[in-house]
């Protein structure tokens, strides 16, 4: 019999829709135990606002994990710094959010949890609380002391990884170095094999410039950097197609023969994916020593506590994490 696993969940910004989505997740059965790293009153108050049943069970790390029954969650308590009003940010709770992320991350690193799923955070309020914070990806990279991580977003039909993430456009060309591409492609290839169960990953690689540089007439990064790296990695046996112009890569004749796309920067690859599957997408951090998935949307403060938040992306993120757990066992 396969051992039941524990998955830890962080709701994210307490004034946003994260707690709503957690309560909605609890309304169905799950084959894993859902351990929510959060404030108890926050969850029970939000459940009452939504008119949904919720029983919180204490987290018992020394007891065997049990599949989650509908209407329940396992609670790993972290106490709010300030009381929460749905839809209204409180700066001090930026500390609370980071505490939940740190505890969940540490639990994955010490083997308590098989995967981590994160709800949406408000980066601005965390920084306003005096905590430098760029995003989940960078936070987990630093805390886990990972050498390098890669952001990938996915729907059921498409996976897009990023060579660079939250950089100003003016800095991207300088950031695309041979060392970076070697690292990113190696991590992408490795995790597609080990976490997604793809024996021989096929990766499409975008060029950096319009028309992938047009033979050097619209930029030379393809000739100077991208093509040499791809040739070296092909010699190692990787199946890489590119560099291809990003404006024509996202069509069936290419995508039907690929397992993932590597875009050179954030707004090159993600608009297509989000147009195709917004609300159904999942953010995955590759290169971490544990499985981490996340929703692909923000805090939606205006919807908090109103029963109008769509739980679809959270369900997809949890289901994908469960599949990845199975692939790594």
UniProtKB/Swiss-Prot annotation:
GO terms for cellular component: cytoplasm. Transmembrane segments: none annotated. GO terms for molecular function: 4-hydroxythreonine-4-phosphate dehydrogenase activity; cobalt ion binding; magnesium ion binding; NAD binding; zinc ion binding. It is found in: Cytoplasm. A divalent metal cation binds at residues 166, 211, 266. Belongs to the PdxA family. Catalyzes the NAD(P)-dependent oxidation of 4-(phosphooxy)-L-threonine (HTP) into 2-amino-3-oxo-4-(phosphooxy)butyric acid which spontaneously decarboxylates to form 3-amino-2-oxopropyl phosphate (AHAP). The active site is located at the dimer interface. This is 4-hydroxythreonine-4-phosphate dehydrogenase. It comes from Escherichia coli O81 (strain ED1a).
């Amino acid at each position: 019999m396969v051992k039941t696993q524990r998955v830890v969940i962080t709701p994210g910004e307490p004034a946003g829709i994260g707690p709503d989505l957690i309560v909605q997740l609890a309304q169905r059965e799950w084959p894993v135990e859902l351990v929510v790293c959060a404030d108890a009153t926050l969850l029970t108050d939000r459940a009452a606002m939504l008119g949904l049943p919720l029983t919180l069970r204490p987290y018992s790390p020394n007891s065997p994990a049990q599949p989650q029954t509908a209407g329940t969650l396992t609670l790993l308590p972290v106490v709010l710094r300030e009381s929460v009003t749905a839809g209204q940010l409180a700066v001090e709770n930026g500390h609370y959010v980071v505490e939940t992320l740190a505890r969940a991350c540490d639990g994955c690193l010490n083997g308590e949890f098989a995967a981590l799923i994160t709800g949406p955070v408000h980066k601005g309020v965390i920084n306003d609380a005096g905590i430098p914070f760029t995003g989940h990806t960078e936070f987990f990279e630093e805390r886990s002391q990972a050498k390098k991580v890669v952001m990938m977003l996915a729907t059921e039909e498409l996976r897009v990884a990023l060579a660079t993430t939250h950089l100003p456009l003016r800095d991207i060309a300088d950031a695309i170095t041979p060392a970076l591409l070697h690292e990113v492609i190696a991590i992408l290839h490795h995790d597609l094999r080990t976490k997604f169960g793809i024996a021989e990953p096929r990766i499409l690689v975008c060029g950096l410039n319009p028309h992938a540089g047009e033979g050097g007439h619209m930029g030379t990064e393809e000739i100077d950097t991208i093509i040499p790296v791809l040739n070296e990695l092909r010699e190692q046996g990787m199946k890489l197609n590119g560099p291809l112009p990003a404006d024509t890569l996202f069509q069936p004749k290419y995508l039907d023969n690929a397992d993932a796309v590597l875009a050179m920067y954030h707004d090159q690859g993600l608009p297509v994916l989000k147009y195709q599957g917004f609300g159904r997408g999942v953010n995955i951090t590759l290169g971490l020593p544990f499985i981490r998935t996340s929703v692909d949307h923000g805090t939606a403060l205006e919807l908090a506590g109103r029963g109008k938040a769509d739980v679809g992306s959270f369900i997809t993120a949890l289901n994908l994490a469960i599949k990845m757990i199975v692939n790594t066992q």
